[in-house]
């Protein structure tokens, strides 16, 4: 069965990609399976300089998902270009760089840096990380700022730009429209929902950062609703994510309005989850009367 999907800058052999921050730069996972099986890889965030991230503890399990406040730990954009991208480029898969910053200038610098390499196929612009003190969140919650940073990155980069939206907003459609107007080639949605967990013996927040981003199956219905709403109003492609653990979840995302998907937290529970989903997808599509990914995308106008 044909699982391929064509998106701006991306010829995906299948619509499954590990989500940013849940796959590092693929090194550890490459010991489990051949990364060429994946539609693409969404790399961990890149900032201008190396970041050590937030103090620990910075991850916690909750009764319905996972909280994290990693704080964009990464070795800095030049290290990523010099060492991580060449290692990933050996695989026959698309590479998407996730870029972050605490100022417009930093986003511009990081976006322009990736022009050095043709091995990166597209940028995912993270305007939505809730766990960095300086800036970050203001780009993801204010349509004016989101538009501005998208415009600057589009101008600085020679690659298609997918803007990753935060669910921590009142009106997701307004955010999506703002970045579409600014020239975004696609959307990536959603990032984590801000949450908190209390450590009972100390009566303090369990995560050192106090709050963290909630991910995993708990956020899937929120993501599906937001993608559905945005799909009605915006015409650029959407890479959907949030709590995907199975091929059925992928189909739900595609029908709601996504064009491809990313799998995040589930990789921590089952390192083979992306390959398992890719293997199961043809049977699940067939079961629900579809004969390709394109077929689902074409027919969803009727179903939704
Ligand atoms: C540990 C962890 C680190 C993450 N780091 C990033 C990141 O660096 N950049 C980014 O855009 N999103 C990051 N995310 C968000 C994920 O890419 C994804 O949008 C979110 O977790 C929802 O998908 P999921 O429920 O499948 O995990 C991170 C998520 C987790 C759990």
UniProtKB/Swiss-Prot annotation:
Belongs to the dihydroorotate dehydrogenase family. Type 1 subfamily. Binds 1 FMN per subunit. One of its GO terms (biological process) is 'de novo' pyrimidine nucleobase biosynthetic process. FMN binds at residues 20, 44-45, 98, 126, 164, 190, 216, 242-243, 264-265. The active site is at residue 129. Substrate binds at residues 44, 68-72, 126, 191-192. It is found in: Cytoplasm. Heterotetramer of 2 PyrK and 2 PyrD type B subunits. The gene is pyrD. Catalyzes the conversion of dihydroorotate to orotate with NAD(+) as electron acceptor. Keywords: Cytoplasm, Flavoprotein, FMN, NAD, Oxidoreductase, Pyrimidine biosynthesis. The keyword Flavoprotein applies. This is Dihydroorotate dehydrogenase B (NAD(+)), catalytic subunit. GO terms for cellular component: cytoplasm. Gene3D superfamilies: Aldolase class I. Its EC number is 1.3.1.14.
């Amino acid at each position: 069965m044909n699982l391929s999907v064509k998106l701006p800058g991306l010829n995906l052999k299948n619509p499954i990609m590990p989500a940013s921050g849940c796959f590092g730069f693929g090194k550890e996972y490459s010991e489990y399976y051949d990364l060429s099986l994946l539609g693409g890889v969404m790399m961990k965030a890149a900032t201008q300089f190396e970041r050590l991230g937030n103090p620990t503890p910075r991850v916690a399990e909750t009764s319905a998902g996972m909280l994290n406040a990693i704080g964009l730990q990464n070795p800095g954009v030049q290290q990523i270009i010099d060492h991580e991208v060449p290692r990933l480029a050996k695989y026959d898969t698309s590479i998407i760089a996730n870029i972050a910053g605490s100022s417009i200038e930093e986003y511009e610098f990081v976006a322009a840096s990736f022009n050095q390499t043709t091995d990166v196929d597209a940028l995912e612009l993270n305007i939505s990380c809730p766990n960095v003190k300086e800036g970050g969140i203001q780009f993801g919650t204010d349509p004016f700022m989101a538009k501005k940073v998208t415009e600057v990155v589009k101008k600085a980069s020679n690659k298609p730009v997918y803007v990753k939206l935060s669910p921590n907003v009142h009106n997701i459609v307004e955010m999506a429209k703002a970045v579409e107007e600014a020239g975004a080639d696609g959307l990536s949605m959603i990032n984590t929902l801000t949450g908190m967990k209390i450590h009972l013996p100390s009566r303090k927040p369990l995560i050192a950062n106090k709050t963290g981003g909630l991910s995993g199956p708990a956020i899937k219905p929120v993501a599906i609703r937001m993608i559905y709403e945005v799909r009605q109003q915006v015409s650029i492609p959407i890479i959907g994510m949030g709590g995907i653990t199975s091929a059925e979840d992928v189909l739900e995302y595609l029908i709601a309005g996504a064009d491809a998907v990313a799998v995040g937290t589930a990789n921590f529970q089952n390192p083979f989850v992306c390959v398992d989903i890719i293997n199961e997808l043809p049977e699940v599509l067939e079961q629900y009367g579809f004969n390709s990914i394109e077929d689902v995308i074409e027919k969803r106008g009727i179903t939704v």
